Amino acid sequence: MSKGKESKVGSSTPSFDDEEDNNPFPHMQGLASLMSEHRISNGSNIQDKGDKDNNNNNNYNNNNNNNNNNNNGDDDDDSILLYNSNNQNDSKSGLNKDTFKSIQINYESRVTRLLRPNSNVRMQITKAGNSNEGMINTSKTYIVYSIQLINNDDPSDEIQTRRRYSDFESLRDVLKKIFPLIIIPPIPPKNYFKFSMLNDLVSGNISQSSNTSSNNSTGANTSTNTTNGLGSNSTNYSYINSTHLNKNKLIEHRKRLLSNFLNNCLAIPQIRNLEFFAKFLDPNANWTDEITLISSQLPKSIYFSNPENGLKTDSIYANLPNPVGNHSINMSFWKPLQENKKKLTKKTNKILNNGNTEASSQPSTGTTSPVNHSPDFIKNKYIIDNSCLDDINKKIMANFIGLANDYTELGTIFNSFSLILSDSPMIRSAKAKNNHEEDSKLNLIFDKIGQIFDRSYITISTLIADLETKFSEPLGEAVQYSTILQFIEKFERRKVRQKRLLEDDVKDKKQELEELLKAEEGSSKIENVMHAQPISKHSGLNSRGTNSTQNVNSSIKSTNSKYKYLPNMNSFKKITQYVTDIIDQNPEQTRKQKITSLQEKIGTLEKCQGIMLQDISYITDEINKNFKSFHTKQLKIIYEILLCYNGFLVEWAKKNVDIWEEIKDEVEKL
């Protein structure tokens, strides 16, 4: 489908038999070529200056100078720089403009070699450090992440580069524009506590219950840990909103998720073969310049680009209508407000309808799709949202942290009782008389019980740390995919809307052309009648012809004025059209020009219709294929996450049982 569509649509785009060429930097001149030209030109200038100063030099010296220049050119061509010239003879004879244009890129960088489809590589972020490189104020620093591209077959073969968080953001934004149908992996959000106040208003009951158990904690305040009730919000999942995490833990969290992002991109063939992605991993590439260059080659909107590959967009896509209306609200805070409204409605219905909320929540999840999908696709479409794993995880983590605080308080209380009892007169007198009654050992029993809660606090703190990194973190990453799927679905809906707008546009243009052709036919008939009558009646016929022409023009105006009551019609356009009709000195010529322009426009729009049919078919097939494979993979990931969660709970429970059994034996010995 993709090859056939591309051959029809992008006729100006070259086709490749072996593999797809995604290089966004064609016909660029290399750095070594510029250096070679600069050196040779400098050498020739020095030689000319020497000839002027020394007129008595013989041809032998001139030949030596030429040989030296030739050797310098050979050294440049045989260097290990990234770009080399294919035409060495031209370098030896001196570069000119034609030679400069004939330079081609014929190298394979280490990054490109490691990113071959059959290579076994992985990426990891080894460290994150502060840097002030490029900052005007050197006292201000930013975090830089060190990326390692490692060959698993040869661990010594590795490439290391350093990128900022904003570089990861720009990479993902460009990938979304190039491949709007591919599920681009998420990256960790930069701002962790976005709209926490609004989330507190919606989730006040949960946050209130968690605050009561965490106000006395030394480092485990979880009021924001339970403020978000929707797993689809990518910036508010449980792990990153835990306020007890310090900056270092958050940086480590971001390192892990950014490593997952890069490795997930490696698993996508379209991204892995993209030269732009290789530039991101190349330490010699200036990423700011690369972003500027690639952005200039992409359309301004993804709705005017080739859905298969934005870098192969044909110029005819610019004639498509814009499916995004001017009245649409595109604000960053609108989506969280809508999601919080849904949750508030759900809670209200639960109170009013005695927990019967399925009917009210079903319309929100059952999003109507313009394309008929398979039943399995619709069933698994919102698997992450319907499971509510992130909501349950927030509550469980809040309970665990509250339980840890309770263990701390209980351990302190029992230890205090033990100290109080040990200083009581009854215990002191029993010790003095060597009395072994049970009352004399009560302080020891309280001390052992206090040790139970102290050790239980240690085990549950270990459990919380493991769940944060091994359960909450991958679960939060999985939650972010729901927003990505919604973005792709919105793209599909708007492309279908774009197709309908295109059909309406073609219909209106054809109707307008038909009216103009009728007017032109009537005008030609009147002109023929005028030429057929005697000259004596010319004045009368002229007046009648003028009236008839005015009637034709008035009919055209009435045809154009049929849209005046439409709400989307711009009043300024009507006024402009009215003024144009008044000052037009040659309406016949204007009408002919409009007919020619409309015929060309209709021809272009009909070509766009053919493109849209192919694009809609391709989009439907790709979404069905990508979503099906994604959900299969995602269900496997969630299954592994739950298995890991189960293992942590079992291990924690066993440790608690061992603690109680051990203390029980010690108490029995007393």
From Swiss-Prot:
A 1,2-diacyl-sn-glycero-3-phospho-(1D-myo-inositol-3-phosphate) binds at R164, S166, K190, R254. Residues 539-555 have a biased composition (Polar residues). CDD domains: PX_SNX41_42 (cd06867). It is found in: Endosome membrane; Endomembrane system. Residues 123-288 form the PX domain. It is a peripheral membrane protein. Keywords: Autophagy, Endosome, Lipid-binding, Membrane, Protein transport, Transport. Residues 1-29, 42-96, 207-233, 536-555 are annotated as: Disordered. GO terms for cellular component: cytosol; endosome membrane. This is Sorting nexin-41. It comes from Debaryomyces hansenii (strain ATCC 36239 / CBS 767 / BCRC 21394 / JCM 1990 / NBRC 0083 / IGC 2968).
